[in-house]
Amino acid sequence: FTEGDEGKVFLNEKNITNSQPFSIARQGMVRTFQLTKVFDRMTVIENMMFSGSNTKNDSLFRSLMKLSTQKNNENLIREKAFEIMKDLNIDHMADSYARELSGGQKKLLELGRSIINDPKILLLDEPLAGVNPKLAEEILAIIQKLSDQGITIIMVEHNIEAVMKISERVVVLAEGSVIADGNPEKVRKDPKVIEAYLGSGNE
């Protein structure tokens, strides 16, 4: 990742600026990627359970050992994985290999993997990139539902209309600088945003 030039990042009043990704995840912040990072040689359910085994209180190795030795723990993770997959409409693909999924379905799988450990903050990197309009609407509805459940969502997205539709606060960047920051209605009317992204027809 690119290191910041200045400033610090705090999570629950703790400085996490230089923390390792696994440490940040255990504190309740997880992320998805624009280019999905699913395990192509695993099935959909295996992808979900692998992520579900990485709990806050155990090392990854210890979690995997538990997964292989404690049937009860495995069943609990499997049940939770199926609940999430059902919400994401990918439960019918549980036994399919991740490499067989479309790009949009991989987006859903990665989203499911990110929420199986009940994060407090979810960072989404271009969740709608390369997704057809119908699936984009489904993903937006899922994101809204997660927000309604109390998960803080921080989303990087170039589909500005989608951003305006579900966001409480919008920060707009152009050429590396902040050009607007506020609620969607305020940002939509900002002259700099109109010039950079919306075009004169939206004035």
Name the predicted role of every residue range.
Residues 122-126:
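Catalytic Walker B motif of ABC-type/P-loop ATPase nucleotide-binding domains
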Residues 97-101:
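Conserved ABC ATPase signature
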Residues 7-14, 26-27:
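Conserved ABC transporter NBD signature motif
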Residues 58-93, 141-144:
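Conserved ABC ATPase "signature" region
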